[in-house]
Amino acid sequence: MKITINNRYMALQGLFWMLFCVSSGFISLYLQGRGLGNAEIGTVTAFFGILAALLQPLLGGITDRSSRLTWRNMILMLAIPYLVICIVMPFVPGAWAGAVFMGLLILLGNTMMPFINSANFYYSYAGEYINFGVARGIGSGLYALLALVIGVLAEKFGVEMVPISGILIALLFILVVFRMPSTKEPVEKAPRVKGLEKGFLLRYPAFTLMLLACLLMLTTHNILNTYLLQIIQSLGGNSSQLGIALAIQAVVEVPVLFGFTKLLKRFRPRTLMLTAAIGFALKALMYALSSSVFMIYLIQVTQMISFALFASASVFYTSEAIAKKDQTTGQAYMTSMMAAGTVLGSLSGGWILELSGMKAMLSVNVIIALLGVCFAFMSVRNIGLRRKV
């Protein structure tokens, strides 16, 4: 049976989201196990999130301008250090050593993301068939499976099972990246206009408004994800139930992602982005009203109309809103909002939780989500607005 580029891209997405599960899904569990408090966890996550937010557009712009640096080379340059860190982590004790290592995993994982998405368009522009929705759905399915496994293993053997799991996943991921072929018709690097990077956001005002909406969506998303363990513990749960909750929210993404191609035939990406913003607000409100771990399990179903829609719609929205010559830069700006959302969500959530408690954190989270809806609506209303350059 011939292994197509589409099959390999599915493997790439699947293994990438398993790597993402190792770092972002279990950061609170790992750092709590190493002895850090909520505010310290938030500060660590925020610091490395800031670095990722700065690196993503920078590396995206360099890749767009370079004829030698490709998305594939950039992924390898980030994935190999990820593997090395996972190997070293179990052998280096100490709370802050663990914090630095886990922070670096978050930095590397977030910085890889725009290049994973760019690979889709690289092959598509060269005439290769890529089913992004199915590939991203496989990513969610494998994220769910790994979340269950790590949750059980961490409860039984301790938190060092988090980086140990990362070793195997990173090895497989690097192997798949090496096996991703070059296309017969490489995508040409478009000529760059002097001063292009400086004026990027000014030239795409509707896109910039949507970036602000995404920042707020991902802030509320990261408040809930980063402190999901603490939310579950406040309701009497443990790390095993954290794994179940993470698995549920990943599994319910799969039908939406698998069927995303059909959704695109009926709705514009910008409409789906607005719907996702409303979904994030609904999820935030329901979390604020939750009273049991079982309710948390039920609320995770709202992932279908929030992050699941966002995960694919943001990629296609960027492709639609941004000129071809700026695609990698545009994707990098979009995915940098995930890193920036990690910063705001982890930092604000950690300090509010430490100083004012769970109820205050979840209430502020609702306000942030509603502001995200407002900016998404403003962007959709101004979609035709462009600056002449």
Located regions from the model:
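Juxtamembrane intracellular "pre-TM" segments in multi-pass secondary transporters
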Residues: M1-I3, M180-L212
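Helix-loop boundary and gating motifs at the non-cytosolic
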Residues: K2-G49, A206-A245
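Hydrophobic core of transmembrane alpha-helices in multi-pass small-molecule transporters
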Residues: G14, A95-M113, L215, M295-L309
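Loop-to-transmembrane helix entry/capping segments in MFS-fold secondary transporters
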Residues: N38-A39, A126-I138, S239-S240, I322-M334
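Helix-to-loop junctions at the C-terminal end of transmembrane segments
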Residues: L55-R68, A154, V256-R268, L353-E354
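Structural signature of the two symmetry-related core transmembrane helices
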Residues: N73-I87, T271-M286, V366
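Cytoplasmic helix-loop-helix junction between adjacent transmembrane helices
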Residues: G103-I138
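Symmetry-related core transmembrane helices of the 12-TM Major Facilitator Superfamily/SLC fold
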Residues: V162-F178, M361-S379
